[in-house]
């Protein structure tokens, strides 16, 4: 049956790593797209599942910031097909202390310790995650597991169905340590407050951005958002010729980073803001002021925005090599390997 079940279902607004990790292991990927409300239709999931379905890997809320309130219906559909459900909780920043993966009937979940639990992204890292599974799946976990017998901690290696060791099984230790101390210092009530403030900050920013000329939220038929929002500059681009890349470059001059979106760009001219709980109202207002100035310039002097940034050591960065597997290399060893291959 394991060989027969060779398909993983995900959604286009789930984190791309959900599809990528499964694809690396040889699974065929089925991707569900959103309806007019920004969410995949349960009927589409019913059509996608079959005797070939191994599992569902989904992020909720998705990267639009929209929470799928029908998530238990999704897990039931997949379970009824004999498959498993994995919950990518990369966007848990707005859910801590409010809802859990188990309550949505997931079999597995994983958290980004480098994002939701105090460690900064740090230019794409240092990434590390915590994986949790139902009791029935423990025997399949990588080894070693750390267990506490009531008196001392110990490594456990005797898992009958284990996949064995994985590279870097300790994770990025500083990120793990920071996450542990942060969780213990915050406590249950503190973690819930983190989520509440993250949602509050995000919705404050959203209301302000919706007043900006040329900016809109994606999927406006669903007005509510959790901890982030996927916006669109489509109207701004149509009216001024200024693109989301141009706005991003201009924000650099004010000392701010503005992120667009994962690829492919389902939302046209996208930009995504996830304020988290860390920033004060004054800091958010400063960020919004930079964005407001950029929009004003776009309508009054679009070339000024298009030629930005002006206060950066790198005037323009060519991002195209990052989309070409033959050119990019994330380690020195990978770089040397590709150089040798070219020769």
Give, region by region, the residue ranges found by the protein language model.
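Catalytic-loop motifs flanking and including active-site residues across diverse enzymes
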Residues: 125, 171-178, 225
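Generic hydrophobic alpha-helical scaffold/packing signal
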Residues: 7-9, 19, 46, 62, ...
């Amino acid at each position: 049956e394991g060989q027969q079940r060779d398909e993983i279902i995900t959604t286009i607004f789930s984190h791309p790593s959900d599809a990528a990790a499964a694809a690396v292991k040889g699974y065929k990927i089925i991707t569900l797209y959103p309806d007019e409300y920004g969410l995949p239709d349960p009927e589409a999931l019913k059509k996608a599942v079959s005797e070939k379905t191994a599992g569902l890997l989904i992020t909720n809320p998705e990267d639009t910031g929209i929470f799928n309130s029908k998530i238990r219906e999704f897990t039931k559909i997949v379970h009824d097909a004999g498959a498993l459900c994995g919950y990518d909780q990369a966007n848990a920043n707005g859910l801590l202390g409010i809802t859990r993966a188990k309550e949505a009937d997931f079999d597995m979940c994983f958290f980004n310790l480098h994002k939701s639990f105090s460690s900064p992204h740090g230019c794409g890292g240092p990434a590390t995650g915590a994986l949790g599974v139902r009791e029935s799946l423990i025997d399949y976990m990588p080894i070693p597991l750390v267990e506490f017998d009531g008196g001392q901690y110990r490594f456990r290696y005797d898992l009958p169905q284990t996949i064995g060791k994985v590279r870097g099984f300790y994770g990025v230790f500083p990120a793990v340590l920071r996450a542990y101390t942060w969780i213990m210092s915050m406590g249950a009530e503190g973690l819930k407050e983190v989520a509440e403030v993250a949602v509050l900050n995000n919705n404050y920013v959203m209301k302000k951005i919706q007043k900006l000329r040329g900016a809109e939220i994606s999927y406006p038929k669903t007005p509510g958002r959790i901890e982030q929002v996927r916006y669109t500059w489509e109207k701004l681009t149509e009216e001024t010729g200024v693109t989301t890349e141009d706005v991003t470059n201009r924000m650099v001059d004010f000392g701010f980073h503005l992120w667009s979106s994962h690829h492919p760009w389902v939302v046209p001219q996208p930009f995504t803001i996830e304020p988290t709980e860390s920033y004060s109202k004054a800091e958010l207002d400063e960020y919004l002021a930079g964005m407001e100035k950029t929009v004003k310039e776009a309508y009054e002097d679009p070339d000024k925005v298009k030629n930005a940034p002006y206060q950066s050591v790198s005037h323009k960065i060519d991002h195209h090599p990052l989309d070409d597997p033959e050119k990019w290399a994330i380690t020195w060893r990978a770089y040397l390997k590709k150089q040798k291959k070219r020769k």
